[in-house]
Structures are given as structure tokens and as C-alpha cells.
Amino acid sequence: MPSIQLCLFASTPEMAELNFLVKVLTGTPEELARRAVAWGYDGIEFMPDPERVPEPGELEKALKAAGAVMPVVNTGRMAPQGMALLHEEAATRRRSMEAFKRMVDFAGNFGARVGLGVARGPGIPGAGPEEMERMADQVFRELAEYAEKARAVIMLEPADPGVTSYINTVDEAMAWVERVGSPAFGVMLDTYQLAEAEPSIEHGIRAARGRANHIHLYDPSRWPPGVLPDKDRLDWTHLARVLREERFSGSGSVVLAPEGDAEQAARKAAEFLRRLLAG
């Protein structure tokens, strides 16, 4: 398998107050970059505050000093901060589009990709398929056009029904990628979604048809891979084999352990994944 950049989910200190779905590394840009490399990773998947996206200079300096990378900007903080790209209220949609575009601009400074997952929202109560489709078409096309100009790439992330009612499978995400037809609008994978929303993990990975170049790597238990092997629900060896067959390349991001020694677990996960993906 081609080399994959391993990253840690990372954000600023106040992230800890948001009760996010998974636990992430928090700290200053310098702390994030330094710890990620020290713990065995190539860099970070950064989750900025969508309402106060930082200037890129400080993070750029920190990454360079640590020898780290930041290939992906995660927009997941939009959800707990009350934003949704697909929302019944026009004011919320405008606020959300503005926030997402700020993160696209931020990513463009690094030549990075931008995940579009829970940022689209849980779905609109009472909205029919045609209404959701019209709204999504407008939003996705506008964002793709914006990303092209910003020299960034948006990655549509399917999510399980517990997170959103709209775009749950890789097949659905790929239909949108084909429909939008922009080089700045692609797809990404997530192992939790693959386990919860696909006919099989293999089906989900292959449905991306080699177009995905980023994957979230964690067990449905929300633990990082290889830390609690007796409790893992995923067959990581099988997953790695399918990724290899699909010639997956790019980057993969890992969460922190939800409890216990975060550093020890992160180091163990990095060692496990490097052995697994080198196979």
C-alpha cells in the first residue's frame, strides 16, 4: 500500500467543553504539532472554531518547527456550535455557509482538504427528498466553486443515521460527487460509518471507486485501533487488505482514547496502524 500520512484529530483547548462525538488532542498550535509527532504521527487533522477560524501563520510555523503536516481541516465543530449547511432557517444556512467558507480559505493556505460530514446537519424535520435534494445541490455546488478558487478540496463524508438522515452511504456520497462534477468536490471514508451504515465494510470502501484519499480510523466503540484488541468490533486486518486492494493512498486520522492514558493509547495505535498498513 502507498504511504499513508497518519494524523491525530486535534483542536484548540475549548474543544473539550463541546462534548464532541470523539475525544481529540487539544492545545496550542505548537503543542498540537509537537505532541502529534512525538506520539508517532505525521501530523494533525485540525478542527478550528468555525466562528473564529485562526490566521494560518501560527499553525504554519508550528507545523514547520515540529516537522508535522496538516492535510485535512475537519469542520465537525459546526454541529455542536449550532450550525448546519442544510437547515430549515435561512439565517442558519447563511451563517453556516460563511463559517464553512472561512475554513475552506484556511485549508487553501496549506493545500489541504476539508471534510464535509456532520456540518451538513442532522436533516430537516418534515422535509421531503426533493426539498433536501434542491437545497443540497445549491449548497454543494456553491461550496465546490468556492473551493476551486481557494485551491482546496472538499470531501463529502457519509455518516451513519445516528448523526444525520441525509447521505448515509458511500454510494449516496459518490452520486453527489458525480453530480457536482468538480475537481474540488470528492469523497472520504470513516470506519464508524462503514461499520454502521454499509452492507459491509468492503462494500463501502469499494463504493468509493478509488476516489477517497482520506479515512477516519477508529473502532465503533470510539477507541483508536489496536488499543483494546479484544474489544475491537472491526476486523482491522480485513479492512487494511481491502484498502490495499483499492490502492488507497493519502491520509488517515485517529481519535484519542475516551479514557485512560491518552498518550500511551495514541502511541500504541500509531504503532499498530503502521504495521498494519505496511503489510
Regions found by a protein language model. Name each.
Residues E45, V72-N74, G115-L116, M155, ...:
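Conserved beta-strand positions in the central sheet of alpha/beta enzyme cores
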Residues M1-G40, I167-L189, A195-G279:
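Histidine-acidic metal/acid-base catalytic patches
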Residues E58-G67, V139-Y146, G204-A207, H238-V242:
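Catalytic-core regions built around general acid/base machinery
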Residues E55-P56, G82-M83, G126-A127, Y166, ...:
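Short Asp/Glu-rich motifs
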Residues V22-T26, L85-G186, E196:
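Active-site acidic/histidine proton-transfer and metal-coordination neighborhood
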Residues M1-G108, R141, S182, G210, ...:
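N-terminal pre-domain/capping segments
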Residues A10-E14, P48-P50, G76-A79, R120-P122, ...:
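Active-site-proximal loop/turn and secondary-structure-junction residues that shape catalytic pockets
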